[in-house]
Design a protein with these regions (language model features):
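Active-site-proximal loop/turn and secondary-structure-junction residues that shape catalytic pockets
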Residues: 6, 33-37, 45, 101-107, ...
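Active-site mouth loops of central-metabolism enzymes
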Residues: 1-13, 134-143
């Protein structure tokens, strides 16, 4: 698994990892593309997911309970064209990519971009702290279910 929800690496680093996986005869790549601290895949119907959710102001350093932050902006996301390129690159190496889009929890980045998606419908910032966040999609709202379907339609 590569956790780019928290730490965006970029296309060239992913390709290096896929090359190493192929060398080791590994055939499944679990790609963690969203989490509380970052949204890394373009969803054309919801551009704020990457505009807001693809960037955080700082990153917690040390263990999960640390109050030390690096003070550096961390950002990045993949366009749909880049995702297709990486999927093709993996397929040529007999590697299947399994993308992960977090839900119903670990949704802080989406809720920072679109507050109406959350259970509390309040404005939040993309978290800089790791560990448990308490923001989840309001799956009782049909509009949120439609959002999830829209996202999955573009991912699949």
């Amino acid at each position: 698994m590569l956790d780019e929800g928290r730490y965006f690496k970029g296309k060239e680093e992913v390709k290096k990892l896929l090359d190493e996986m192929a060398r080791l005869k590994m055939n499944t790549f679990h790609w963690h593309l969203t989490d509380d601290q970052g949204w890394r895949i373009e969803i054309k119907k919801y551009p704020l997911l990457t505009k807001i959710g693809g960037k955080r102001d700082s990153t917690q350093i040390g263990n999960w309970n640390s109050n030390i932050y690096d003070g550096k902006v961390h950002e990045g996301f993949y366009t749909q064209e880049e995702i297709k390129e990486i999927i093709d690159y993996a397929a040529k190496r007999q590697i299947t990519i399994v993308p992960e889009i977090e839900m119903p929890g670990h949704a802080s980045t989406a809720i920072a971009a679109y507050p109406q998606l959350g259970t509390e419908k309040q404005s939040i910032k993309v978290p800089t702290r790791f560990g448990v966040q308490y923001h989840a999609y309001n799956v009782a709202d049909p509009k949120v279910i439609q959002f999830i379907k829209d996202v999955l339609d573009e991912v699949c």
